[in-house]
Regions:
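C-terminal alpha-helical cap of glycosyltransferases
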Residues: 395-408
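Active-site and donor-binding regions of nucleotide-sugar-utilizing enzymes
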Residues: 17, 21-214, 232, 237-238, ...
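Structural loop-to-beta junction motif characteristic of Rossmann-like glycosyltransferase folds
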Residues: 145-146, 312-313, 332-341, 357
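Nucleotide-activated donor-binding/catalytic signature segment of Leloir-type glycosyltransferases, i.e.
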Residues: 93, 97-101, 269-298
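Acidic donor-binding loop of glycosyltransferase active sites
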Residues: 120-124, 291-322
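A short, well-ordered alpha-helix in the C-terminal region of glycosyltransferases
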Residues: 380-394
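Short alpha-helical segment that forms part of, or immediately flanks, the ligand-binding pocket
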Residues: 305, 328-332, 350
Length: 408
């Protein structure tokens, strides 16, 4: 990569180091990257080759996961190296059983890149969705390692398509194949001369069908929601709750499960203060107590996606911040999904709105209009839920298309 790119990486690395003195996420990243080469020395089988899957965070992990599962299903002898950029992915999935080695990806500095690739014999490399690291890509190409990006999605606003984007366009030339989510991405790439592109779809759809088939017993959630119109609020933030909770307080004909994105005693306490109806916490209640409550607060991680099967309607948070969280996990159950206005980067959100399987709201007034109709009109509720579930079913198969193109 050129001098300016490498300077940018060095400045970013320095910024992480400074932030680590006061920010826990940066602290975890810095400490985790410092452990990477020790993990590789301890766990890598130097006589074997590895399929390398790199993801940024937890959401991208869920896109890479179906491919890892398919690789292990058909070729269990293959070894997988899984790397993360963000602590929010690594800290949750560092013990993922299908990966033989899991670690942080070192910063994209030439010396670290060479050291990393010298430590592991890479058979094939897969980057997921948005991961474009110029030094890794150019070094993989120089070494002749087949390299792919999966579930990628491109937008006209990205640097690849700007007059100043030559450095970033060169990165695209390092991929043997780009598997994109939609035709719009393929057309954008064709416009800059990139034609080794396959419209395969989004592997996350295949992941959510696995969730659909997971019948883990959740007696507290099941007992709480039985026979009631139950709104599930997933991965909520304060701006979401500012209008969801007041509406809930005024509508005794509904129940609510609320799962905040960040769980802390302060967050839970604030939610409980705002609620004017009986509420219980998931970790501190029984099925019998939950059945008598009006609101169930999910104060632990790992059960939200499985819990949506008990929902009547889902609201997915994040739409008043950096962007909405995973809406497919709810839509797969054939229920309408509601979210805030910052959804433009997410193809599935745009598609679901166009198909009327989802609704976007910009505040409390619009939210009330949507919820009033869903609460009062059973046929309307059923119809829009069917639109959501049908969209998920129609978009299955990306993992198989990618696997067959590379491994068959």
């Amino acid at each position: 990569m050129n001098l300016f790119y490498n300077l940018g990486i060095s400045l970013y690395s320095a910024a992480v180091g400074i932030a680590a003195t006061r920010n826990n996420k940066a602290r975890l990243m810095k400490a985790g990257q410092a452990q990477t080469f020790g993990i590789l020395a301890e766990k890598v089988d130097t006589s074997a080759s590895y399929i390398w899957i790199h993801v940024s965070s937890l959401g991208e992990f869920e896109q890479g996961r179906p491919l890892m599962e398919m690789i292990k299903k058909h070729t269990p002898e293959k070894k997988i190296l899984l790397t993360f950029f963000s602590p929010s992915g690594y800290e949750v999935r560092k013990d993922y059983p299908l990966a033989d080695v899991v670690c942080y990806l070192p910063m994209d500095k030439p010396s670290l890149v060479r050291r990393f690739l010298d430590a592991v014999k890479i058979e094939k490399a897969f980057f997921v969705k948005y991961e474009f690291w110029g030094n890794y890509l150019s070094e993989l190409k120089r070494r002749g390692v087949p390299t792919y990006i999966i579930s990628a999605i491109f937008r006209p606003t990205q640097a690849f398509f700007k007059w100043y984007g030559a450095t970033f366009r060169r990165m695209l030339g390092c991929y043997d194949m780009l598997f994109v989510q939609d035709e719009e991405s393929r057309a954008l790439l064709a416009g800059i001369g990139v034609d080794n592109v396959v419209v395969a779809g989004d592997t996350r759809f295949d992941r959510v069908t696995d969730i659909l088939e997971d019948h883990t017993d959740l007696p507290v959630v099941e007992s709480f929601s039985r026979g009631a119109f139950t709104l599930f609020v997933g991965s909520s933030w304060q701006p979401d709750e500012d209008f969801i909770i007041p509406y809930f307080n005024k509508h005794p004909e509904m129940k609510m499960v609320l799962a905040p994105h960040e769980i802390s005693e302060d967050r839970i306490s604030g939610i409980l203060t705002g609620l004017k109806r009986p509420a219980v916490r998931y970790t501190k209640t029984t099925p019998e107590e939950a059945a008598e409550a009006d609101c169930l607060i999910i104060d632990c991680y790992g059960i939200l996606s499985k819990s949506y099967r008990f929902a009547t309607v889902a609201y997915v948070g994040g739409g008043f911040g950096v962007g909405i969280h995973n809406i497919n996990e709810a839509a797969v159950y054939g229920i309408p999904v509601v979210f805030g206005p910052k959804y433009g980067k997410f193809k599935e959100a745009r598609d679901l709105i166009a198909l009327e399987g989802a609704f976007t709201v910009s505040g409390g007034d619009e939210y009330a209009l949507v919820m009033n109709r869903l609460l009062s009109d059973g046929e309307y509720l059923k119809k829009h839920g069917e639109f959501a579930g049908g969209y998920i079913r129609d978009n299955l198969g990306a993992t198989r298309r990618i696997y067959d193109a590379i491994f068959k």
